[in-house]
């Protein structure tokens, strides 16, 4: 009898092993499954952090460097020779990564994406691949280590942003790009090996031709080191088949797990995962990613409306802050994130774990749904009533979460919501509908 039990156990283990081998993303790279994407789809809000030596001057990270290949953005203010020496003055002694992560969590964020290397090539960890890194600043300490440890401590999912562009590396876009491939693959290996669990790899644009990049080798390594990691859609955003066509099946995984509209709210889209990345600092030149004291800080109300517009469109919001050169977050950003967090604590249940719809969002606001519940998020409007698209189903009950009592009438032309002006929320009036099953 015991022998039969052991045989059965052995067969179960063999079957499990075969299943794992069949689903080994390193052996056969593939996009993330729906199950692997679920935490991200439920999270809705992440914190993006752009930082580096550019903060010493309060200029746009990378783009302020005069002499980069794209001098048409209007950011260019610092000669390359001066920009490339800013790291010698980068000494953020007041950095408290634990405080940053507490701030993110209290704001309602479920994940954080931190800049490890931007287009200027400077590395915020002690990489072995170049001397242009944090070790050779007055600060010297591994900032990525501090971010990773604090994120893990506070239960935030960890993401690394990595720019595959590198305007200061001598081998970037040279010849067949093989030396640069070796360089950046080795850096990705460091980032996915030395910091515990990494949940997101957020690439940002590489240029050239398909044949110049070993994408299959890269993604096999990524999935070998972090089997359930999510990867955005920018690993090959500006790689064009001018000389070589992508090999069969390559686009299936290189196109990534989700889209990334930038400085704009994505369109309503329930069939493809997407995440809008937007800055808390608004600048006239369209930047504001890194510390920009010349910019305007979006207040909590504006950030909430951006979040609601994103989530009702079935997307996530990656909201960006740019720390000061001291290592501190700007006080007004901290204040507005705390206010946003207070709102999320009260109303986040209408966003977290939901999907956008069942009707498209618009200037009026939008809707989220989960089970038999639909939450209407209504931005301020004129008049007594608001006519929305028709709902696919019959409303069983209505509850106004932000005060007052709305009435909802279903007609052949749509859904009419009526609520007196004094009962409307200044930012987002939320009406909960229970639908008949």
Name what the model sees in each region:
Residues 1-6, 104:
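Positively charged n-region of N-terminal signal peptides that target proteins for export
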Residues 2, 9-10, 427:
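A detector of low-complexity, intrinsically disordered, Ser/Thr/Gly/Pro/Ala-rich segments
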Residues 6-17:
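Bacterial N-terminal signal peptides
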Residues 22-437:
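Mature catalytic domains of secreted/periplasmic carbohydrate-active enzymes
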């Amino acid at each position: 009898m015991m022998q039969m039990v052991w045989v059965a156990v052995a067969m179960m283990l063999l079957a499990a092993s075969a299943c794992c081998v069949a689903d080994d993303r390193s052996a056969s790279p593939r996009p993330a499954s729906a199950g692997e994407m679920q935490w991200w789809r439920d999270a809705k809000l992440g914190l993006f952090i752009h930082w580096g030596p550019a903060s010493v001057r309060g200029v746009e990270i990378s783009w302020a460097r005069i002499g980069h290949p794209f001098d048409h953005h209007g950011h260019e203010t610092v000669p390359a020779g001066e920009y490339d020496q800013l790291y010698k003055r980068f000494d953020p002694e007041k950095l408290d990564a634990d405080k940053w992560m507490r701030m993110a969590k209290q704001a309602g964020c479920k994940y954080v994406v931190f800049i490890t290397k931007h287009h200027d090539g400077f590395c915020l960890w002690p990489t072995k691949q170049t001397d242009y890194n944090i070790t050779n600043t007055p600060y010297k300490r591994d900032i990525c280590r501090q971010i990773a440890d604090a994120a893990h401590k506070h239960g935030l999912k960890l993401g690394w942003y990595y720019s595959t562009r590198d305007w200061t590396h001598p081998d970037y876009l040279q010849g067949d790009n093989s030396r640069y491939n070796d360089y950046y693959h080795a850096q990705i290996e460091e980032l996915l090996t030395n910091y515990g669990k990494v949940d997101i790899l957020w690439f940002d644009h590489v240029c050239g031709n398909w044949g110049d990049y070993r994408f299959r080798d890269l993604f096999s390594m990524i999935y070998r080191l972090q089997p359930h990691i999510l990867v955005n859609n920018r690993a090959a955003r500006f790689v064009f088949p001018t000389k070589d066509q992508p090999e069969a099946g390559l686009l299936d995984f290189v196109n990534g797990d989700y889209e990334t509209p930038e400085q704009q709210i994505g369109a309503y889209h329930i069939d493809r995962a997407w995440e809008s990345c937007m800055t808390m600092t608004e600048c006239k030149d369209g930047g504001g990613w890194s510390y920009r004291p010349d910019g305007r800080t979006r207040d909590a109300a504006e950030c909430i409306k951006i979040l609601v517009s994103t989530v009702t469109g079935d997307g996530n919001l990656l909201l960006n802050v740019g720390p000061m050169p001291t290592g501190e977050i700007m006080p007004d950003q901290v204040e507005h994130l705390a206010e946003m967090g207070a709102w999320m604590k009260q109303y986040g249940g209408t966003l977290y774990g939901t999907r956008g719809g069942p009707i498209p969002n618009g200037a009026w606001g939008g809707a989220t749904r989960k089970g038999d519940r639909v939450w209407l998020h209504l931005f301020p409007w004129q008049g007594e009533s608001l006519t929305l698209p028709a709902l696919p189903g019959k409303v069983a009950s209505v509850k106004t979460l932000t005060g007052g009592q709305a009435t909802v009438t279903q007609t052949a032309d749509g859904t009419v919501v009526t609520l007196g002006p004094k009962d409307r929320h200044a930012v987002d009036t939320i009406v909960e509908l229970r639908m008949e099953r």
